[in-house]
Amino acid sequence: MRFRIVTAAVTWLACGSLAIAAEPAPLSQEQLAKAIKIDSLTIPTPGELFAALEKPGKPDWAGQYRTPIPMTYRNRAQIALNLGGLIADGFIAVEAQDSQQVKNIGTDIIKLAKALGVSENVLSRGNSINEFAENSEWDALHEELEATQNEVKTSMQSHQDQDLVILVSLGGWIRGTQAVSAAVIKNFDEQSAKVLRQPAVVGFIHSKMNDISAELKSEALVKSVNDQLANMEKLVAFQTGKGPTLEEVKKLNDAVSKLMDEIQKKEDAK
């Protein structure tokens, strides 16, 4: 059986523009044609990314679940980062075809989105997520999650919260990378691990983080995350044409797991 691996950029549907020279994505021409483009950077949609890597066997997606995170964050930057991570969790639950987990994650997504003051359009999607999960409509759930994250970002932009849009995307990238690297470690082969090579994407994220307001950039959590991106870029810059070694994937997983723990820690960023 062949399966799809959730890739590290699972929720990186960035809203903004910055031209960089991106490396070719490991996708077919048809998949690339469907990708979302931001100037010269091509960002594949989650569906295309899931199809980018296939290998025998079925992953234990339920094994990539994490314990529920707090829903009582007060700091908006921390909420945005965790919202991105939750959206990635939603895609993982869909891959696991776990209706109850999808509903649980969907409820939490709406709670954090509401804390950021998003539009009623976003909040109403909670019912759709529950309905599709109840009926095991996995393709529809994929589309609904993508629509939800896009509406979250659109709503933030309309409220002049572009900086928070970046943080939502970053939170999704970190959580997605954690899940993918863990899945690769569990059943390692070099070909599958190549999906983790994405220095252009990390460089793009880092450049967008440098564009956020000085006030937000000075917050302890945001500063820590931004400082660690330089190391992340090195960890995903494997030799061209070769996949990473198991040890390299483990180092990447350790780094993103540590960062994810910092993001979801209950103490609010100051």
Region locations from a protein language model:
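Secondary-structure edge/capping motif, primarily at the C-terminal ends of alpha-helices
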Residues: G90-Q97, L116, E120, S155-H159, ...
